[in-house]
Curated annotation (Swiss-Prot):
Homodimer. May interact with ROPN1. InterPro entries: cAMP_dep_PK_reg_su_I/II_a/b, DD_CABYR_SP17, IQ_motif_EF-hand-BS, Sp17. This is Sperm surface protein Sp17. It comes from Notamacropus eugenii. Residues 74-117 are annotated as: Disordered. GO terms for molecular function: calmodulin binding. One of its GO terms (cellular component) is membrane. It is found in: Membrane. Sperm surface zona pellucida binding protein. Helps to bind spermatozoa to the zona pellucida with high affinity. Might function in binding zona pellucida and carbohydrates. CDD domains: DD_CABYR_SP17 (cd12100). It is a peripheral membrane protein. Keywords: Membrane. Residues 122-151 form the IQ domain.
Amino acid sequence: MSIPFSNTHYRIPQGFGNLLEGLTREILREQPDNIPAFAAAYFENLLEKREKTNFDPAEWGAKIDDRFYNNHAFKVPSGATESKEAPPEKSEPEKETPQEVVKEQETQVSFVEEVSTDDEEAAAAAVKIQAAFRGHKARKEVKIMKESSIEEQ
C-alpha cells in the first residue's frame, strides 16, 4: 500500500519474501484449482516440518539474503566455512577423518588440472574473436572509403 506523494516505504519482514517465493513455486508446480486452500495446506505443512526438524526456511532464507546483500566474505578466512548457513538436510557431518580431507584435496587438484586442459578451446575462441574484430575493422575501412569516394564526386 502506498500513499501518493509520500516518501514512506514499508519494510517487508525478513524471511517473508522467501515464504512467498516458496508458496508461489509450489502453486506454479501443482496448478491447484483452489489457491487459498492450497496455500493454507502448504503453510500448515511448513509449520509441521519446522516443528519436527527445528529448521525454519524463512529464517535460513533471511540469513542467505543478508549474506548476499551484506557480503562479508572478505572478513571470513578463505578456508573457513560456516555450517550455520546450510540447511540441515544438506549440511556435511561435523567430524571428518583425515582420509576424507585427503580425498577433498585430491579432487581440488584434479579440478585445477581440468581447467588447464581447456587451452585449445581458449585458443579457438581467441581466433574467433580476432577474426570478428578484423572483419569489423575491414567493414569500417570500406565504409570510410565509400564515403570519401562519394564526397569526391
